[in-house]
Amino acid sequence: MEMVINLLLFYSKILVVLLLFQQISNQPIKPLWYIITPFLYVLLLIICPPVGYFAYFFIFIAYNIYRNRYKSKILNIFYGLYPIIVDSLLGRMLGFYVFPLLGVYVFNEASLSWYDILIELLVFPFHLLIVKSLRLDFNEIKEGFKRHYFRYLLLLINISMLVYMLLVSTFVIYRDKLANADIWRGHINNFYIILFFV
């Protein structure tokens, strides 16, 4: 049963990241790809888990650079990383803070439950709520980048997202060897939520 939950979790994770990617990049994704892409990713995870795990972090960057070859690499990297990082941040925020308010504790990533899938499916609506509340417009980022307003800021954001990805992955991979890995991951999550949304 745990394997089924795990596969459904990864399927829903890719689905949510695709929705986030389309929202911020304004690149249309055909509805069929919302079915095929998560399925192919789950298949890759079954065949070769390490490749599937690391491909998750870089597939959207590679896709963006391939599709927009003659446009800014910094913007392509931003569009590739942002959905993955925001999915991770908001998912952990829901798991660490919102669900415990409801009496549901899902701190341990080693044991999965149906709540993990529910959390994943709530990430996109939660992101929409934050974007609407803060009145964020991703088209303004694109326009500002064309005029060189955000170039260095976006470079710093990309570096910070890569650092987040590296730190969280390290704590997940070495959770058995590092004392208080879950607590440190929570602190990193808090810091990056403040950095991204405040």
Residue spans for each PLM region:
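Alpha-helical membrane-embedded segments
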Residues: 122-125, 189-197
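Transmembrane-helix signature of polytopic, membrane-embedded enzymes
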Residues: 29-35
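Juxtamembrane segments at transmembrane-helix boundaries
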Residues: 2, 7, 15-29, 47-178
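Hydrophobic, membrane-inserted alpha-helices
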Residues: 14-18, 36-44, 58-63, 192-197
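Membrane-interface helix-start motif
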Residues: 176-188
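Signal-transmission coiled-coils
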Residues: 182, 197-198
